Amino acid sequence: MGPAIHNQLYECGLKTTSQDGFLMDNYETQLFQSLNRFINFINNANQSASNKEQNTKFCKSSSNFLRLKLLTVLRQWCDSSRSNCTLEVRDVLTQWWVTLLNFLNSDTSLQIDTALELSLSIELTSVCLECLSKIMTILIILPFHSSRDMEIYSHHLLLTIHCITNKLILISKNSKKLKRTNSDDKCSINDKKLQYLNKYSSLLRAFIGKLNAYAFFYLPEDFHFDTILLLTVSPQISSSIQTSLFSWKKRQYKFTDDQGQMIRTEAFENKDTKFFKIIVSYIKNDFVLMSFYWHYWYIILQFMKFSDSDVGIKKSTLSCIPGSEILLTHVTTRFLNSDLNKFTRIIKQTPNPRIANENVTESHPNFKSLNSSNALITSERINDYVFSNFKTIKLWECLRSLSGCILKENHPEYLENMLSLHESLLIDYVSTISAYDYIAANVIYNKVLQFIIFQFESLPSLKFIQWRSWYNGLLSMLRTKNVNCQTVSLLCLFNIWKHVTIEDRDEIVKVLLSDFWESLIFENEFPLIRILFMKVLVFKIIPSVQNSSSLRFLPHDRIKQLYEELLVNKEELFEMQKHDSNDIVAHRKNALVFNGNSRLMMIPKKPNTEDHLVYKINHDKNLTTERFPSVSSVANTRPNVILKNGKYAYDILDEMTSKAAFLLAEKKTRLNPKKNHKIMDGYEGGQENEDNDEDSEDSGSHKNKRKEGNSSLSATLNTWLSKFSSTSEDSQKKKEQANELGNDFEYDEDVADFAEILPKQSSSNIEKIFKHGNNSGSMVSYNSSIKLNRRENILIGPPELRFSNEIKEHNSIATIFKLVFIQTNRRVVEKIDLANMKWGTIHGGSKYMKPLPVPKDLVASVAKNESETRNLATLCGNGLDFEIPVPDFNIFGKCMEDEQDVAKIGNQNVEDLKVTGGREVTIWKQIQDMKLRTRIQKICVLIETFNATVREYFEFSNRLEHDGIFIDFEVRKPSSNNSINIKV
């Protein structure tokens, strides 16, 4: 490579590649020269590479030549958002396409009798496949291309399919042969060969999805490739002739139940179609399907960008987009239906801990450890299962990556319509589920919907979620008055509140404070519902209505009405003291406690970073801990990236990218060992137990302050500045990994033609820098010990890594409410028993417990105490003001209170009521007295809960923003671990 050209690459590597700043036309001559040199090199090398050492040098030299001469140019082109190139450039890229296919076809490493030492390296194969993939993208056929371009492109696409399919056949056949071989002396050789075949197969699978997508659109219709693929997805389809967005595609597909109209493969089956079925069959793999789906919509959106047709992306025009109706239904309705069915089966298989251990209850702090032998499906395992296995989760992560690519190219006009179409089909299916099915609702609203928000909140310009449809479902669950359904609804409202539009928020506030006020605070007997509703009111509703002229005073008036009603009934409240003076006061310390010993504790959230997870998975292959233990753990994480061990999931990339990603993750993890050690299920400094005393609870929460500031190493993988050197501070393992990466650019002294472009290795150490610029994303590689002609060798990084990389750094959750267990006080149990006796409730005591008569002296004692209390009331009057809870109105700020008349409930004066019959009057009086006591008790509890929640809010607002908080716990069946709901 000449100095001028080399400097040109260096400049492109460090500057932002604008849409017009990079021209492939400038590299036409360079690409032709590189092509000729590569052909000469591989022809000469085939004669000399006769041993392992020479073959290794050949593979490394070939890999580096392709990286620096071809792959760098292709990556720059794909990153420049250009969609057209000259005929000459198309010709040279087509020649490269044929050459790479011939090079891969000439490889005999997949033959069972080929020595492993003489096989092409996996790394060289990955470089070739990425070059092929990039060429396919650059040469994509769009509306302005000629029919000649279409024919050439289609022909080479067919050659690629044959090449990849033949390799898949060889891998499958030889793998079976090797597994059947039981000879001990060949065992180690066979194992190595099998490992090689598995790695090769993994590379091909990463490319198959994209290859299927391009073949779906660009192979001639006579091959019926699109029909074969759609039949693999769903066999119950029919076809008809109709005009399409793609002028050369005439067939429209739709679902049918008519056996006579269904497509039969026998009608068009031939030698080619049988061959296509092999590569199409891989669509059944989730990752291959998502890769196909990514490129399927990429081709459509690119085509629409330059099309003169009026076809848009909406339900009424799906017939003009080939296969869209079939594929959309499959990945939305069928995916979610399959996910929920599998999830329900798993939940139903959960053993009942009460049967396994009668002496341990679910609220026991050590419940998990005491019942570990029962293999309970914990909340952590459920969340990990959902985010690891749900196809719906994979779908929306795929759409998020595609959105990042399309927005980079500055044509989002059809993108929102495409996303809205997927969301509307999802809503259509959700609307068919009963509002009483809280298990499905919890998965959909608190996992799937929340995951969609997490994925797209880093792209605020995209507004495609139809909030009105979602909150209509939430309100339907509130109307059921089922505790589990209401819990799911309130949880979702709290967590999604900041993302809902202002208009929809106001509508929700009106409905909650008008239609559901009495239902949620008085008619509901579950403390959890009261606590969650108060959290929604204090943390979300009150701050959001401060600027609303019509709703500003509504929450204030509601709380004020409660307090005034309490004041009116103050005398009756005093009369209640003679029965149990602690009934009301006890709620001040336990206002936020539910299920006896459970509480939602506010603690800082420590991000469970992708880099840390990638390092753990690659460092420990037998890792058994959950990768996604909670919903908040995926707030800044891409599950598919983790499941692919840090690799890009939707296309084939050079293996060096994976090595660099792992080394970067390791470096970040090792530089923050203390912080990473503190990460436990995504939380930092959480407490498992706390005292019943309120002061200890407050002090415990203050100890869990969130550590401010983030390390500079939390920058994305697209800003790599990772320097690997062998210093005295590095461990031996780090040296070996750095040397391994350094050897990727090892210099072959026997090939003089490549000496000018391959950096040499220093005898003392290796200093390599792989660098992605903040804007250009360019990956730089140079040897600092020996600089060739004082120029650096540049390798541009793959632009795919930036498509969804913002998710890693977009940490929208700073604090969470986590379920914790508090120490159970024996007095609480006694109070529960007293309350049960007082109201005549039959509780689940020992089956041998016999009710005993009350002693006569105890009856006399109670009567005497009542008389003394009545006399004391006469003397002291209303001197018990300290017993009445007063709402904390400070949260409303300087709210101008409306002096409106509040409907007041006065004491019922029984003497003024003219009711005949002494016994009837007495019974009626007792009933009214009990009603009033119950009402007053509920108001006191509500005010205490409100005040306790306000204290939490002030503690939170003093440190962080109002919308950076998240409630993170699981709604489970009452017989399962970590349950937050009980059935009465």
UniProtKB/Swiss-Prot annotation:
Molecular function terms, GO-annotated: MAP-kinase scaffold activity
Protein name: UPF0592 protein YDL073W
Phenotype upon gene inactivation: Cells are viable and do not display any phenotype.
Acidic residues bias spans: 687-698
Annotated source species: Saccharomyces cerevisiae (strain ATCC 204508 / S288c)
Organism superkingdom: Eukaryota
Region span, Disordered: 675-712
Protein family (similarity comment): Belongs to the UPF0592 family.
